[in-house]
C-alpha cells in the first residue's frame, strides 16, 4: 500500500511541481520512498509522542527532547549520524538566515546537523514537515543527488545544492495531521557552537 501511495504522491508532485525540480519520475519516486522509509521507522514513536503532547501529558520541552531522540535514533537506523538542534533567528548559522530549517554535512566525518529555527515553528506538523524535508536533503546530499541547476537559480533563495524536499515536507504534514497542535519551542543555547564545525554543503 505504501508503494501505491508513494507513486500517487509522485504523480501529484510531478504535475504540481513545488519548484524547479529537474529530476525525472523515478528520481522523485526515490526521494518519496526516502520519506516513507523514515516514517516506517519513526512513525509509531512520533504518533505516540504527538498524542502525549496533545493530551497535555508532556510539555513542549519534553516533546522537543523526545523528538530529538526519535529522529537521531531513526537516523542511525538509516545509516545517518544526525544531530537535531533547536535554534532561533539570532543563532541560526549565517548562511541559513531566514530558513525554517537547514541541513549540514561534515564531509570528513559523515556527521550531519539539522538546525531548526524555533521562531518559525508554530505547530507540530510544521516541525515534523521541516525535519523530514531536511533529512531528505541530507540523504540526497550524501548520495550526490542534488540539483545544481536549482542551486544556481538565485530566485529560489536556496543557498546550497537543493534537492527540493517539499514533497517530503508535505508528506509528513499529512501523515501527522491527526494529532497536530500548536507548540512554542525553546532554543538549545548550549548547542550553538556545534554549527561552526559544519559547512553547509546542501
Features from the language model and the residues they span:
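Hydrophobic, membrane-inserting alpha-helical segments
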Residues: 1-2, 125
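Short, compositionally biased, intrinsically disordered N-terminal export/targeting signals
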Residues: 2-12
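Auxiliary, metal-adjacent structural segments of Zn-dependent hydrolase domains
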Residues: 42-108
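Active-site scaffold of zinc-dependent metalloenzymes
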Residues: 85-128, 141, 157
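Catalytic glutamate of the conserved HExxH
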Residues: 130, 134-142
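Post-HExxH zinc-binding segment in Zn-dependent metallohydrolases
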Residues: 143-182
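Charge-rich, low-complexity N-terminal segments
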Residues: 178-202
